Design a protein with these regions (language model features):
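N-terminal Rossmann-like NAD(P)+-binding domain of SDR-like oxidoreductases, especially those catalyzing
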Residues: 1-185, 229, 239, 308, ...
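C-terminal substrate-binding subdomain of Rossmann-fold SDR/epimerase-dehydratase oxidoreductases
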Residues: 17, 23-24, 30-38, 55-59, ...
Length: 335
């Protein structure tokens, strides 16, 4: 039975990846920080909804990306054949408020894991979660694996470091270490501070009579949005091929926040203009340009392709947030 280790297992991507690997018969180990409260809402269903389904094949370990000794301990204990490094301080706007912490966790956390692989001597394959935010002030459209990086946030800068140190260790030590340059990917498990989930969550609260307003920043910002559940399949595929490499994972489509508002509010028959208020605090100090990824390489070499359209993604998110609010999406949505 293959063993996999996931950092950031309690996040959107980590929880979907854990489910995928468990379905494929893996023993899955995840790392969580010890804290006074635990964010386990995304992974608790795996444990409790059907406890016999995975027969104890999901285990959690205490550790921290700021603590190299904990990473060494976990790798020596687990000896995973595959490592998926998803853990990070991943909110772009917040990275301007805590740049040093972002650099430490998102940037240096990567080299701590790579060094732990070397020090423990385990034979493993490594996946690094890179980001389209590395392109920032884009140098060409669409972006490919060879497009120069020009990050526009502390988060983007930290991810550039993580990308290049992964490439460096691959070349210097012969590691099977791959970068997945993932463009924006959303789901009902997306954190509520991210704009897409903030929109769909607020729609549900509006219909439940709990709020009347949605505060947003730049409505003209454009992103290449995909479905997180599709994207974790690409992560797994990267570690199944003989040679490590770097891949753009994207839909090759771009949509504005304004379009997301049109689609999501339209599903429940509401005009978003009646609820949205522009708040300057949600504008980034430096905004990225047009992010649109070309996934041709991943499609050709891995056989991966996005399965879920933009409209389908928005529908999934609105549907699930209405359910979470105790509402009936079948009655409220234009399906």
């Amino acid at each position: 039975m293959k063993k996999a280790f996931i950092t950031g297992i309690s996040g959107q991507d980590g929880s979907y990846l854990a489910e995928l690997l468990l379905e494929k018969g893996y023993e899955v180990h995840g790392m969580m920080r010890r804290a006074s409260t635990f964010n386990r809402e995304r992974i608790d269903p795996i444990f409790f909804e059907n406890p016999t389904r995975f027969k104890g094949r999901l285990q959690l370990h205490y550790g921290d990306l700021a603590d190299a000794s904990s990473l060494n301990r976990i790798l020596r204990t687990v000896k995973p054949e595959e490592i998926y490094h998803l853990g990070a301080q991943s909110h772009v706007r917040v990275s301007f408020d805590i740049p040093e912490y972002t650099a430490d966790i998102t940037g240096l956390g990567t080299i701590r894991i790579l060094d732990a692989i070397l020090e423990t001597g385990i034979n493993t394959k490594f996946y690094q979660a890179s980001s389209s935010e590395m392109y920032g002030k884009v140098q060409e459209v669409p972006q490919t694996e060879s497009t120069p990086f020009y990050p526009r946030s502390p988060y983007g800068c930290a991810k550039v470091y993580g990308f290049w140190i992964t490439v460096n260790y691959r070349e210097a030590y012969g590691m099977h270490a791959s970068n997945g340059i993932l463009f924006n990917h959303e789901s009902p498990r997306r954190g509520e501070s991210f704009v897409t989930r903030k929109i769909t969550r607020t729609i549900a609260r509006i219909l439940a009579g709990k709020t009347k307003e949605l505060a947003l920043g730049n409505l003209d910002a454009k992103r290449d949005w995909g479905y997180a559940k599709d994207y974790v399949e690409a992560m797994w595929m990267m570690l199944q091929v003989p040679k490590a490499d770097d891949y753009v994972i994207a839909t090759n489509e771009t949509h504005s926040i304004r379009e997301f508002l049109d689609e999501s509010f339209g599903l429940v028959g509401r005009d978003w203009n009646e609820y949205v208020r522009i708040d300057p605090k949600y504008f980034r100090p430096t905004e990225v340009d047009l992010l649109i990824g070309d996934p041709s390489k991943a499609m050709k070499q891995l056989g991966w392709k996005p399965k879920t359209s933009f409209k389908e993604l928005v529908k999934i998110m609105v549907y699930e947030d209405l359910k979470m609010e105790g509402l009936d999406p079948e009655k409220l949505m234009k399906l």
